[in-house]
From Swiss-Prot:
Pfam families: KOW, Ribosomal_L26. One of its GO terms (cellular component) is cytosolic large ribosomal subunit. Belongs to the universal ribosomal protein uL24 family. One of two assembly initiator proteins, it binds directly to the 5'-end of the 23S rRNA, where it nucleates assembly of the 50S subunit. Located at the polypeptide exit tunnel on the outside of the subunit. This is Large ribosomal subunit protein uL24. Part of the 50S ribosomal subunit. PROSITE patterns: RIBOSOMAL_L24 (PS01108). One of its GO terms (biological process) is ribosomal large subunit biogenesis.
Length: 123
């Protein structure tokens, strides 16, 4: 899928916002930790529920936790350690963009994901 429909920033933005959900998955790529990248032979992978990530930017910088939820519509992930209290006093997860995290541990229970890693592996 190519998002380069035009050189105009407004059209670039529009193509991201209007992308169908099955193509938005490509926006969820996150960097792997150096040890994990060396072990798997891949630099980036899409973030999934169950992965352990380290937050690199924002108020929760340095927090490590499991991914609880992935929101394809808003292009945000929710991590166990990143919570805040809302106006009702309830604890809610804070939305984080996938580009602002680094995957520390990958959930490899899915065979399809293992095939993706094999396909992407550097030769």
């Amino acid at each position: 899928m190519s998002f380069t429909t035009s050189a105009q920033p407004r059209k670039q933005r529009r193509s991201l916002y209007k992308a169908p959900l099955h193509l938005r998955r490509k926006l969820f790529n996150a960097k792997l930790s150096p040890e994990l990248a060396k072990k798997l032979g891949v630099k980036r992978l899409p973030v999934r529920r169950g992965d352990t990530v380290l937050i690199l930017r924002g108020d929760f910088k340095g927090v490590t936790g499991k991914v609880v939820k992935v929101d394809l519509k808003r292009v945000r992930i929710y991590v166990e350690g990143a919570t805040r209290t809302n106006s009702r006093g309830q604890t809610v997860y804070y939305p984080i963009h996938p580009s602002k995290v680094m995957i520390v541990d990958v959930d490899l229970s899915d065979k399809a994901r293992q095939k993706i890693i094999e396909r992407r592996k550097k030769k």
